[in-house]
């Protein structure tokens, strides 16, 4: 759903507005390089996030399981099982991890970058009623009737996407 001020998205199922591409679960391949060498290939930004969560906490077992998986719900499940998880440490790193994953996703897929840039200066909003961290904790239909400063969620994913958009606007 799109308004004059907002671009709302939720879920990776294809829709006419093309906003499903903003979802962490949207299936798209992209690669990560370290020192000029290919380090890993991902099937979604969700896989990147959960793999880097496992790396952050030194859990190579779950890192390998996450990298072997292509089903988004299973990737999320495995990410929630990362050993040695510390929420304070995760909170310090999660925004940067998700930003870098999405930066790779959009920079390596020009059609996705084009759609991101087409949002102009609108506020990009993950309208997930069940997510108050990455989303706003409301549906799009609920959000349009509530002032933005009253939304219960942080919309971190929307902020990530707007940061990447700003980096690429001319």
Swiss-Prot record:
Family annotation (Pfam families)? NADAR (PF08719)
Hydrolase recorded as keyword: yes
EC class (word): hydrolase
Is Metal-binding given among the entry's keywords? no
What's the Enzyme Commission number for this chain?
A: 3.2.2.-
Gene Ontology molecular function, alphabetical: hydrolase activity, acting on glycosyl bonds
Q: Which UniProt keywords apply?
A: Glycosidase, Hydrolase
Q: Which positions make up the signal peptide?
A: none
Reaction(s) catalysed (UniProt annotation): 2,5-diamino-6-hydroxy-4-(5-phosphoribosylamino)-pyrimidine + H2O = 2,5,6-triamino-4-hydroxypyrimidine + D-ribose 5-phosphate; 5-amino-6-(5-phospho-D-ribosylamino)uracil + H2O = 5,6-diaminouracil + D-ribose 5-phosphate
Q: Which family does it belong to?
A: Belongs to the YbiA family.
Q: What does this protein do?
A: Catalyzes the hydrolysis of the N-glycosidic bond in the first two intermediates of riboflavin biosynthesis, which are highly reactive metabolites, yielding relatively innocuous products. Thus, can divert a surplus of harmful intermediates into relatively harmless products and pre-empt the damage these intermediates would otherwise do. May act on other substrates in vivo.
Q: What is this protein called?
A: N-glycosidase R617
Organism of origin: Acanthamoeba polyphaga mimivirus
Q: Show the taxonomic lineage.
A: Viruses, Varidnaviria, Bamfordvirae, Nucleocytoviricota, Megaviricetes
């Amino acid at each position: 759903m799109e308004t004059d001020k907002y671009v709302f998205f939720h879920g990776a199922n294809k829709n006419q507005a093309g906003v499903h591409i903003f979802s962490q679960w949207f299936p798209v391949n992209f690669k990560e390089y370290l020192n000029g060498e290919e380090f890993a290939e991902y099937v979604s930004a969700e896989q990147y996030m959960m793999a880097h969560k496992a790396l952050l906490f030194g859990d190579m077992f779950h890192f390998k399981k996450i990298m072997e998986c292509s089903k988004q719900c299973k990737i999320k499940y495995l990410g929630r099982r990362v050993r040695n998880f510390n929420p304070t440490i995760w909170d310090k790193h999660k925004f940067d991890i998700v930003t870098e994953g999405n930066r790779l996703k959009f920079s390596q897929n020009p059609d996705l970058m084009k759609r991101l840039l087409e949002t102009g200066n609108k506020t990009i909003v993950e309208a997930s009623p069940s997510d108050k961290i990455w989303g706003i904790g409301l549906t799009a239909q609920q959000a349009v009737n509530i002032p933005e400063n009253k939304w219960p969620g942080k919309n971190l994913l929307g902020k990530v996407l707007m940061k990447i958009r700003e980096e690429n606007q001319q």
